[in-house]
């Protein structure tokens, strides 16, 4: 049995080698010839699974993407060909939410505001958006959500119409898939009209898909230099990056918001377990068994936390400025976008750290944010 695995998928080689011969490949440059005599294909979001790619896939029976997003896969085509498909919904929701929170925290420091005084508008209330909503509300931050699909499906949460959310939110963060068709397409959801209507004190974060925001219109909006702030983890034509847009952004990173070690381990184990089920194999893997101990597994609090403490403990685990600085330094080099993804550091989630303090430390909201907590006597 031959299994192609994206070379950027952690723990995949050791897991899938239990099932057959593993062939590691760079996901963005896979060709139809690569899939000749291949039984299974394990990918990430950079691999476009379409008619061209599988045109010579004479043995392919299983495709798994270790990502929550699935818009890079022609699922109807795979179904037509009798090829089983699976994804890893929710695997990276924590990492993406913590990326967005880091952007908020750092901008709060830089611009001199409190996140607790702001309204955060979340567009897209799927796995990521819903998790971010839970975290922010658990911290006592005012949140608005928009998701017409969830609303129409009878989701009991209170949804805000898009135009109202955009007008009422101080921070707008995007967590939608990319779609061009249907009742609620998201391609250029944030277009020239929306961007020109944004106030100078508003912040836009895109950690969803690049084309959700019209990057040319965003560049023109940022050129007004009226205080409007934008942070992008995804770009409309990535891996190509508009080098005129880059200096206008508060933060820019190479599609790594969901690249935390826990999220990648979850994605790998989810599709490994699905493939084992497909093969009627009893092997199973658990992400927690693969992860190393965090560099700083425990932090002690000696008093009730305040916003400064929150800044310190969250940034100790993940500070978006680290990725932003590397991106600006390296992006002009050939192939840099994918190299930064390939060589991404072992970023951890808040859950890798236990906060220890007594009852006066008010640890419960920090648990809502994702930290493990331990109340000392």
From Swiss-Prot:
Active site: residue positions: 209, 238, 255 (proton donor)
**GO BP term (any one):** pyridoxine biosynthetic process
Residues bound to NAD(+): 127-128, 147, 176, 233, 258
Task: Report the catalytic activity.
Answer: 4-phospho-D-erythronate + NAD(+) = (R)-3-hydroxy-2-oxo-4-phosphooxybutanoate + NADH + H(+)
Q: Please tell me whether the keyword Cytoplasm is annotated for this protein.
A: yes
Annotated metabolic or biological route of this protein: Cofactor biosynthesis; pyridoxine 5'-phosphate biosynthesis; pyridoxine 5'-phosphate from D-erythrose 4-phosphate: step 2/5
Record bears the keyword Oxidoreductase = yes
Localization in the cell = Cytoplasm
Gene3D superfamilies assigned to the protein according to its UniProt record, in alphabetical order: 3.30.1370.170, NAD(P)-binding Rossmann-like Domain
One MF annotation (Gene Ontology) recorded for this entry: NAD binding
Which keywords has UniProt assigned to this entry?
Answer: Cytoplasm, NAD, Oxidoreductase, Pyridoxine biosynthesis
The protein depicted here goes by the name Erythronate-4-phosphate dehydrogenase
Q: Tell me which species this is from.
A: Vibrio parahaemolyticus serotype O3:K6 (strain RIMD 2210633)
